[in-house]
Amino acid sequence: MNWITNYVRPKINSMLGRREMPENLWIKDPSTGEMVFHKDLESNQFVIPSSGHHMRIKAKDRLRFFFDNGEYTTLEAPKVPLDPLKFRDEKKYIDRLKDYRSRTGMDDAIVNGLGTIEGLPIVATVQDFSFMGGSLGMGAGEAIIQGFEKAIELKRPLVLFASSGGARMQEGILSLMQLPRTTVAVEMLKEAGLPYIVVLTNPTTGGVTASYAMLGDIHIAEPGALIGFAGPRVIEQTIREKLPEGFQSSEYLMEHGMVDMVVSRLELKATIARLLKIMTKQPANSDAPAPQKPDADSKAA
């Protein structure tokens, strides 16, 4: 054994050896298969630069991109019974909740943020699909109501970002009870004369579309979002017919009058700020992009 064996060879092996790389450095575009560097994706608000595909986004990132300078404060999540039905499927519901809380750092699927957009104070309520598919249970329902109550208290508009698979089956009727409760909260906000804008993101399905997600003064959808009560596969199996191309997509729903506009995530802040300033009779920002004029066909329609 000599110094080449003892020193040089290990050095060469360490330099040329296989290094462990984080698994999430590159993210695959579901629409094209293109690999995108994670920092490029994050700097573009998790919108694929080449294809415009909108990736799912966590609640805290959504709030950071939405509010001025990324500054906001969150409301403490309301405390609710964790597992009143003692439900169990493949594992105990209480254990499933603990697992999601550990993975996401969230108490439940809803985060309420207070901040400003273009200087206008608002309340933003964000549903996070990464927490049990954004499902609506007691915790999420209470947090939504908390957001509406805070908006009424502070006399601020409320912007809600919906992203959910529907009611949380592990909570049974206690989950379904959140549909009328959140609907009442919407009515309270409207009675207070405060604007309510809903942003429908991918996916927005199930019971949320039968309650607060479709009760806004204005409905904006992100491009390519799946929006509907039941999924297209379930509908096809039920009616035994092939659905139209793009059925339940944002663009399809706008063409058929179910949403008011489809707006890229990159333009959401400016668009919502302009709408809220009009609705609250404040001077609009001249730097914000102006709405497109309707073409001849839409005028005729």
Curated annotation (Swiss-Prot):
PROSITE patterns: COA_CT_NTER. It is found in: Cytoplasm. It catalyses: N(6)-carboxybiotinyl-L-lysyl-[protein] + acetyl-CoA = N(6)-biotinyl-L-lysyl-[protein] + malonyl-CoA. Keywords: ATP-binding, Cytoplasm, Fatty acid biosynthesis, Fatty acid metabolism, Lipid biosynthesis, Lipid metabolism, Nucleotide-binding, Transferase. One of its GO terms (biological process) is malonyl-CoA biosynthetic process. Its main location: cytoplasm. The keyword Acetylation does not apply. One of its GO terms (molecular function) is carboxyl- or carbamoyltransferase activity. It is an enzyme of class 2 (transferase). Residues 25-294 form the CoA carboxyltransferase N-terminal domain. One of its GO terms (cellular component) is acetate CoA-transferase complex. The keyword Nucleotide-binding applies. Pathway: Lipid metabolism; malonyl-CoA biosynthesis; malonyl-CoA from acetyl-CoA: step 1/1. Its EC number is 2.1.3.15. Gene3D superfamilies: 2-enoyl-CoA Hydratase, Chain A, domain 1. PANTHER family: ACETYL-COENZYME A CARBOXYLASE CARBOXYL TRANSFERASE SUBUNIT BETA, CHLOROPLASTIC. Acetyl-CoA carboxylase is a heterohexamer composed of biotin carboxyl carrier protein (AccB), biotin carboxylase (AccC) and two subunits each of ACCase subunit alpha (AccA) and ACCase subunit beta (AccD). Component of the acetyl coenzyme A carboxylase (ACC) complex. Biotin carboxylase (BC) catalyzes the carboxylation of biotin on its carrier protein (BCCP) and then the CO(2) group is transferred by the transcarboxylase to acetyl-CoA to form malonyl-CoA. Belongs to the AccD/PCCB family. This is Acetyl-coenzyme A carboxylase carboxyl transferase subunit beta.
